[in-house]
Amino acid sequence: MAALCVLGLSEVNMEMTIEKQKAVADDVLHKLFLIQPYAIVAGGAPRDWLDGKLATDVDVFVDTRHINTAKKERELFAVAGLLRFEKGEGRDWDDIPEHYKKNPNIKRVYNLEIDGVAVQLICVKCPCWDVVEQFPIPICQAWYKNGRIGTTLEYKLCKKVGALVITNHVY
């Protein structure tokens, strides 16, 4: 397994805020822009931020359809200034939560910590925007990009009626 050396860690973990989580998300998306301008933060973090809550982690979805090996993904993330890799092979699927393994669009997941914020780079084999609409629970169909949070119509309907429903059985 590859040894990950995370760049951008702070020595002092200041009190966590939604603004700090968004700043880390903005920084990651900015660093990814040249290699993948369509990367987005999606799922739980934008949903939690809309509800005024801290997110447990920030999931950054990166379209890596054009990249056929984990080594090339790691090299691109290193060029973006997000990772520095030492000798090793790549992520082991045993370390990845089961719900990610069930999603047919996810290729690999890289776990990072940046300035005290847990960040997951989730490599997908489809356009990032497609991932959002395929989330099986509409309350997770939210995304963050360019300082703004967006949601699907299904998300808005679920929030309005206060119901938790499953609308997609892709995984």
Protein language model features and the residues they cover:
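Catalytic cores of the polymerase beta-like nucleotidyltransferase superfamily
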Residues: 2-171
